Amino acid sequence: MPFTLGQRWISDTESELGLGTVVAMDARTVTLLFPSTGENRLYARSDSPVTRVMFNPGDTITSHEGWQLHIDEVKEENGLLVYVGTRLDTEETNVTLREVLLDSKLVFSKPQDRLFAGQIDRMDRFALRYRARKFQSEQYRMPYSGLRGQRTNLIPHQLNIAHDVGRRHAPRVLLADEVGLGKTIEAGMILHQQLLSGAAERVLIIVPETLQHQWLVEMLRRFNLRFALFDDERYTEAQHDAYNPFETEQLVICSLDFARRNKQRLEHLCDAEWDLLVVDEAHHLVWSTDAPSREYMAIEQLAERVPGVLLLTATPEQLGMESHFARLRLLDPNRFHDFEQFVEEQKNYRPVADAVAMLLAGNKLSNDELNRLGDLIGEQDIEPLLQAANSDRDDAQAARDELVSMLMDRHGTSRVLFRNTRNGVKGFPKRELHTVKLPLPTQYQTAIKVSGIMGARKSAEDRARDMLYPEQIYQEFEGDTGTWWNFDPRVEWLMGYLTSHRSQKVLVICTKATTALQLEQVLREREGIRAAVFHEGMSIIERDRAAAWFAEEDTGAQVLLCSEIGSEGRNFQFASNLVMFDLPFNPDLLEQRIGRLDRIGQAHDIQIHVPYLEKTAQSVLVRWYHEGLDAFEHTCPTGRAIYDSAYASLINYLAAPEETDGFDDLIKSCREQHEALKAQLEQGRDRLLEIHSNGGEKAQQLAQSIEEQDDDTNLIAFAMNLFDIVGINQDDRGDNLIVLTPSDHMLVPDFPGLPEDGCTITFERDVALSREDAQFITWEHPLIRNGLDLILSGDTGSSTISLLKNKALPVGTLLVELVYVVEAQAPKQLQLNRFLPPTPVRMLLDKNGNNLAAQVEFETFNRQLSAVNRHTGSKLVNAVQQDVHAILQLGETQIEKSARALIDNARREADEKLSGELSRLEALRAVNPNIRDDELAAIDSNRQQVLESLNQAGWRLDALRLIVVTHQ
C-alpha cells in the first residue's frame, strides 16, 4: 500500500479508534497514531487491515477545530488530500482543509460512508438487519399488537375487553367480571398494550397487602412486566435517590394500606405523574354520601390526578347499587355525581335491554317493537335496517347484529363497565359435593357441655362461632397438652383420603392458622405426606414459596393447608380437589374458597369434600349451604342477601345444633327465597352489557387470529438467526424447550433480558403454560424486542459486499442492493407506528439504474450470494467507488416516488381512522353521556399531531450491499 506521512486511515478491525494518522514508516511497517484515543498501532505495510479515508465532492466533513466544510473539490498534493469547499458556519467559499487536520473522532454512520471507509459487515448481518426491519414493520401493523405476547390461554372474553380498552386514550373503566373469569389477566393485557404502544409509560398498581407478591409475579411471569414493590423500607431507601421516591421507578406496586397510611406518602404518589392507575379489590373501598372511608378518599385523590384508571371489583349485583355508583364516581365524578339520578337512569335502560333480548331471540318483531327500536336508536335513516332485520332475507342476521351494536353504543355504562358472567362464558367445570358425616368424639362432647355451662352468658353469635370449631373449645380447656388431632375423625379421614390419592394435588382450607399448622405436623409425622402451609402469620415471600412448592408437579407438596386467608386472591386451578376441614361463617367466604379452584382454565371437574361432625354447628351449616342455597355446586349470587335475612334464625340453630325443630322449614324458606332472587337477578341481568363485554363472534375471531399467529415459523427462524449472530448459546433440550446462555463472544457484553445464568425458552404457548420456568417467546417478548433494537439502533449489517456466481452475466457486473427506511419522528404516545412504522423499501439496482427488486426476491437472492473477506472487499470497493456513487445517485432519484406513496397512504389511513372515531364518538355523545369530553379532545389533538408528524416524514438509506458478479 502507498503510505505517506500525514495520511488519514481507519482500522478495519477497530473502527472505534477513529481516524488514524500515518506518523512513521519503514520498508516493511507503518505506524498509525489515533489521536482520539492516544493509541498507536504498528502494521505490516504489505497486508495491513486499514482503509484510506477519502471523501468526495458533496460530502460534509469536520475539522479538528469543530467547524464543517461542504466539499466542492478534492485535490492531491504529494500523496496527501486537500479538500476545497464552503465553510458552513461562516459561508466562506474556497476554504481548504488538509486531511491531516480532519477531526479524529470521525464516526462513519451512513452505510455508504462505512462501505467506502472499509467498515464492511459480515453478509449474514446484512440479511439479519433487513429481516429485522421487515418483521418489525409488519408486527407494528398487526391489528392485535400487544395481545399476543402474554403467557395466557387465548380466552375470547378476556381478549375482547383488552382489545377494546387497551387501544383507548387514558382508559377509565370498571372490570367487574364474576369471580374466576380473570380480571387480573384482563388488566395485565390492557397494561401490556398501553406500555407496548407507548400510550402509557408510568403505571401504579394498588392492591390488598396479601396480593402484592401475586401481582408482582403475575405481571412478570405472564406479561414480562417488571414492577417494583414499594413498602416502608423501599420507600425510605428511595428517598436517598429522589425527592419523590416514586419517581425512581416507572412501574410500581404498593398496598392500599401503604398508600393511605401516611399523608406525605400519598402526596408523593399523587405527584408522581402516573399514566395508569390499577386498583384491585376496589369493592373494599367503603363509601357513603356523608362518610367516605379514608381508603376511598385516597384512591379518589389519585384518580383525580391519573389520566387512566382501571378498577377491578366484584359484580354490581354483589355490590349493591350505591356501592356500584361509588366505583363509577371514581372514574368520572362529573358524569356520576348524583346517586338518585343514577338510579333513575338505570331504570331507563330497561327498554334497551329488552330490545336487545328481542333481537337476539331471532323472532319477528311487531310494529310496536319496531317503533320502539327506532325511537331508542334515534337515527334518521334507520328504517331500511329495521326492515332488513325483520325480514327473511339473507342479510337479516347482519342487520340484527348491526342494530345490537348501535344499541350498545347508546347504552349507559357500556364504555366504562365490563362485566362477564359464568352464564355467558363457556369453559367452566362442574362442582361436585362429597359430604362425609363423622361421629362426634366423646372428648368434644364433654368440652362442648362444659363450654355451654361456662359460656351461658355469651351471645348467640359467639356461641355459634364456638360450636363451629369444637377443636378450639377442646384446646382452650386442655391448653398446650391438648392433642385434638389424635382423636378427631376428620384427621383420620383426611390422612386416608390423601394416602389413597397420592398422585393428586389437594387444597385443604380451614378457618384458623393454628389448625393448618397442627395438621401439617400430623400429616408429616404420621404418613410422611408432603404438605405446604399458607397462613396470615407468614411473610408474603414465604407464602409465595409455599404456593410454588405446591405447584411443582413431581417434587412438590401433595397438599396445601390454608387458613382462611388462603381463599383471598390466590388461584390454584392446577388442582381440582378441595377439602374444607371446617366451614366458613358466611356464604361469601365459602364462594371464595371454592373460587380458588373454580376458575376459567380449570381442566377438571372440582371435587369438594366436606368432612363434618354430626350434632355440631358444622352439620347445621353444611345442610343450610347445600340445601338452602345450593352454594357448593353452583355460584350463589343470592347468598349474602339470604344470609342477612335468615341471620337471626340461623345463628340460633348454630348455637344449639341439637335443637333442630323448625330447621327444615328454614331451609325450605331459604331455598324458595334463593330461587325467587335468582330468577329476579336473571331477569334483571343486563344482557346488553354482557354481550358487549363478552364480544361474541368478534372475540372468537380475535382469539383464532392470535392462535394462527402462534404458528408463525418466521419468528423461530429469525430468533435462531438473531441468537446465532449476537453470540447467544442455544441448547435444544427437546419437548420444544431451548436453553439460552451468554457466550464470551457476544456482540454486546450484556444482552438485555438474558440473565447471566441463562434462561429456558419455548415458542409453544401450551408448553409455556405448563412450564413456569420457560419463557414464552413471541415478537413481543423483551428478548426479541431488545434484539431488534440492538441490531437496528446501531450500524450492525448496514454495509457489506457479496459475490454472485452467475455465468449468464459478464464478470465484474455491479449490482447495488439498497434498503431505505421511510419513517416519521414523533413522541411514542402518538402511536405513529400504527400508520407508518419504520418501513423498509428494498431496491436492487444495476449500473443503469434498473430496479430488479420486484423480479429478484430477497431470500432467494441471498442464498445465491457468497461472502467476501474484509480485506478483499476493501480493494473491490476502492476499484468501483465511482460506479457505486453513480448508482447511489440513481437510487436517490427513485426512492422519492415509493416513499411518497407510503407516506400518503399512511396519512390517508390515519385521517380516515382517527376522524372516523372522532365523528362516531361525537355523534354518540348526544345519546350517551359516558363519552368523556377529555377523551374527545385527546382524539382530536392526537389526530392533528399524527397528521402533522406524517407531513414531516422522510426517508434515509439504512443499509447497502455491493454485489460483484464472478464466474469462479
Curated annotation (Swiss-Prot):
It comes from the Bacteria. One of its GO terms (molecular function) is helicase activity. It holds the Pfam family Tudor_1_RapA. A motif (DEAH box) lies at residues 280-283. Coiled coil: none annotated. SUPFAM superfamilies: P-loop containing nucleoside triphosphate hydrolases. The keyword Chaperone does not apply. HAMAP family: Helicase_RapA (MF_01821). Belongs to the SNF2/RAD54 helicase family. RapA subfamily. Interacts with the RNAP. Has a higher affinity for the core RNAP than for the holoenzyme. Its ATPase activity is stimulated by binding to RNAP. This is RNA polymerase-associated protein RapA. It comes from Salmonella paratyphi C (strain RKS4594).
